[in-house]
């Protein structure tokens, strides 16, 4: 953590692995397809502290989304364990209870397009068992926090891309979770919506919440993250503060540090070209 002091571990993952099976194209001679097992995530362990923003970096297909889905208990790991601290500092591992402490956002998050943002949040409040008066107060707070006051009563199907993304994030906030897990939350957004989401993540950090998020925007990660991990082929190949990554790679910014880390890991010109094609 940037602020120093002994940190409270909010979420801990030990030796996470996720194995998938993919079908390989038919052999021209035998006209048979074959199945190959592979690990999208291969023995990853992380601990994230209260009030910390952790950035998850890596090229497409590196395993970022699979890792985040396992941390959010949306996907069950093949092996490994995940635990989270509640607001009362109680360690829990039951996936159902873990979900109650997490706000998760992915690119596949579905909204109720026929409802207004406010109506959707009210419905989610009922699902979480939040009292009506408390729910209305939460909606007003969230609307102000994410700069949604101008469109909170508009139907979701009429919102812009950036407004829809803010509504998606609002969906994660209604139950006041301790940990936020976001998969590329600013991808493809205009600067106003992107800045609103960045401001939100900084605000949550200042309130002691934990944020884990993936991004391809290195400048954003350098500015926002207390710590980053770089994933390639399902493994962590580097971790540390943005400054430590830059120092270890003798680079002047995180983007250069990212490229240099991948190049160092590839060990050779052929692998270097392969890596560039992924980015």
Report residues per predicted region.
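ABC ATPase "signature
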Residues: 239-240
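Helix-to-loop junction immediately C-terminal to a conserved catalytic motif
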Residues: 72
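Conserved ABC transporter NBD signature motif
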Residues: 80-91, 97-98
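Conserved ABC ATPase signature
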Residues: 155-159
């Amino acid at each position: 953590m940037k602020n120093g002091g002994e940190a409270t571990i909010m979420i801990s993952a030990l030796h996470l692995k996720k194995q998938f099976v993919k079908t390989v194209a038919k052999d021209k001679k035998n006209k048979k397809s074959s199945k190959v097992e592979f690990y999208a995530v291969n023995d990853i362990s992380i601990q994230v502290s209260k009030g910390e923003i952790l950035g998850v970096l890596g090229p497409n297909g590196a395993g970022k989304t699979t890792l985040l889905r396992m941390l959010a208990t949306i996907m069950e790991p093949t092996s490994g364990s995940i635990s989270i601290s509640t607001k009362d500092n109680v360690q829990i591992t039951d996936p159902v209870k873990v979900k109650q402490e997490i706000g998760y956002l992915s690119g596949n998050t579905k909204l109720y397009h026929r409802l207004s943002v406010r109506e959707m949040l009210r419905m989610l409040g009922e699902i979480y068992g939040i009292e009506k008066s408390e729910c209305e107060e939460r909606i007003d707070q969230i609307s102000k926090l994410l700069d949604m006051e101008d469109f909170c009563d508009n139907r979701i199907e009429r919102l812009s891309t950036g407004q829809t993304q803010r509504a998606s994030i609002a969906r994660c906030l209604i139950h006041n979770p301790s940990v936020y897990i976001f998969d590329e939350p600013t991808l493809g957004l205009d600067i106003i919506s992107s800045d609103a989401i960045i401001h939100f993540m900084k605000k949550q950090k200042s309130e002691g919440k934990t944020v884990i998020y993936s991004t391809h925007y290195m400048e954003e990660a350098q500015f926002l993250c207390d710590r980053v991990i770089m994933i390639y082929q399902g493994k962590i190949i580097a971790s540390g503060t943005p400054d430590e990554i830059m120092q270890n790679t003798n680079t002047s910014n995180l983007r250069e540090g990212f490229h240099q880390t991948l190049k160092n890991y590839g060990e050779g010109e052929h692998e270097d070209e392969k890596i560039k094609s992924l980015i």
